């Protein structure tokens, strides 16, 4: 059980290897776990009452609503190794085979995304004009490597308007809850940008990667008790070093190290550390008082990073209430369809334990950059919107037998055009303050895998600093 040390008012001199980690989400926990494995002494300050950040679940009467991320992608050896090292290798449950199929709405009906070249030729999702135009993609000139281009412009230039409207736009809505006309392709989808730069073509690049791809397959997985098993597994060996319910008030650099001031339950305290790792949301970093660092005030610019509101609406039905077979990962809704949802996950198809026997669970997302005003509706109004959309798309009849609404007022950082300036601010502040490190989804990518990889980067940098400086 994670606990909080009683000596809140202690003011201790820095001891060798003590590193403050601000934020107990996946980035912070991965950082601390790796630092401990390296023989150092991390202390995690987390304001909420449990580790994991956006990861969490509501479990009631046989239903499980994943409040934030719903799954992990086993797409890198690093992620697979970390899962095994924290003791969860044997607890992975992989998405059902049916989850390979994904639906897109076109002209009011759900159409399966083609999963092969032959299926692509026959799909009604794209017109023959769009399919034929795609044949010219390998011969289209790439943009300059340093060009700042939106995701929308990139896709239209390489693949055509229809692929933007009925493939990339719904994908961006599902991943970022964002707008492809606003996002930077280099920042939001760096792999797409890299494919074009390396191979001159997305199609040629995809074929080349298929030939050389090794390591684990990109399989989707979770755990029997949901994704929150991961942060708890990371936090468990850290024990009392995870300080829950601690709000960080400020950080200051001094002659004897880094002073972290904090508050818990109205009681203030402070401790000194050899180094500080900041793994907090962008808006929290922007508002964090940081003293005695040249140019630290520039971090206030991070408050300008857009985070649209998103609401996750969980609805449970009896199997007989839903006409659609729910034989897929879920359905994404293109903006051109003018509907009121971003998409719906078929949660009980993905993994077992999400709904009682004889029932189905659906997780629907509302809001984002596309419709931020809808995220402001009250719960009854939101449920009416979602029920109406599910009735139209999936043939869901009657009221759901279970519901839960989870609101994220500032959901996902938007890697918009010009986003590099925010990263440059962070880099400049770090350069002016040895022993002060910043990472997380506002800098390293928004996926859980990105955050886990950021934790490794931050731990390596902090450990190298402490070891080199002998502090």
Label the model's feature ranges.
Residues 61-143:
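Dinucleotide-binding Rossmann-like beta1-alpha1 core, especially the glycine-rich loop
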């Amino acid at each position: 059980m994670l606990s909080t040390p009683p000596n809140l008012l202690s003011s201790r001199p820095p001891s060798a290897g003590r590193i403050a980690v601000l934020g107990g989400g996946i980035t912070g926990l991965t950082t601390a776990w790796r630092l401990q494995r390296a023989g150092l002494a991390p202390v995690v300050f987390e304001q909420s009452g449990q580790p994991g950040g956006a990861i969490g679940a509501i479990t009631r009467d046989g239903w499980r609503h994943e409040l934030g991320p719903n799954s992990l992608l086993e797409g890198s050896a690093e992620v697979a190794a970390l899962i095994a090292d924290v003791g969860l290798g044997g607890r992975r449950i992989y998405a059902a085979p049916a989850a390979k199929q994904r639906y897109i709405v076109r002209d009011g009906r759900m159409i399966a995304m083609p999963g092969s070249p032959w299926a692509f030729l026959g799909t009604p999702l794209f017109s023959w004009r769009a399919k034929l135009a795609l044949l010219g993609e390998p011969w289209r000139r790439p943009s300059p490597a340093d060009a700042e281009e939106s995701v929308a412009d990139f896709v239209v230039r390489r693949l055509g308007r229809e692929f933007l409207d009925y493939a990339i736009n719904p994908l961006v809505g599902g991943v970022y809850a964002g707008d492809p006309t606003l996002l930077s392709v280099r920042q939001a989808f760096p792999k797409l940008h890299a494919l074009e730069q390396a191979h001159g073509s997305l199609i040629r690049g995809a074929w080349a990667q298929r030939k050389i791809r090794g390591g684990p397959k990109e399989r989707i997985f979770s755990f029997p008790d949901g994704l929150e098993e991961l942060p708890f597994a990371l936090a468990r060996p850290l024990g009392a070093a995870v300080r829950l319910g601690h709000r960080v008030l400020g950080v200051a650099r001094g002659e004897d190290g880094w002073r972290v001031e904090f508050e818990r339950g109205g009681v203030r305290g402070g401790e000194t550390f050899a180094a500080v790792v900041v793994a907090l949301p962008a808006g929290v970093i922007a508002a964090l008082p940081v003293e005695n660092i040249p140019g630290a005030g520039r971090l206030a610019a991070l408050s300008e990073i857009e985070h649209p509101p998103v609401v996750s609406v969980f609805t449970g039905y009896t199997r007989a209430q839903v006409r659609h077979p729910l034989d897929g990962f879920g359905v994404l809704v293109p903006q051109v369809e003018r509907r009121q949802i971003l998409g719906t996950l078929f949660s009980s198809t993905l993994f077992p334990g999400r709904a009682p026997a004889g029932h189905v669970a659906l997780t629907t997302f509302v809001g984002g950059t596309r419709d931020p005003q809808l995220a402001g509706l009250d719960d009854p109004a939101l449920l009416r919107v979602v029920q109406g959309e599910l009735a139209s798309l999936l043939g869901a009849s009657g009221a759901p037998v279970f519901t839960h609404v989870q609101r994220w007022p500032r959901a996902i950082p938007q890697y918009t055009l010009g986003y590099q300036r925010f990263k440059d601010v962070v880099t400049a502040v770090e350069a002016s303050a040895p022993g002060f490190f910043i990472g997380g989804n506002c800098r390293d990518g928004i996926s859980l895998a990105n955050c886990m990889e950021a934790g490794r980067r931050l731990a390596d940098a902090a450990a190298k600093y402490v070891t080199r400086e002998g502090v």
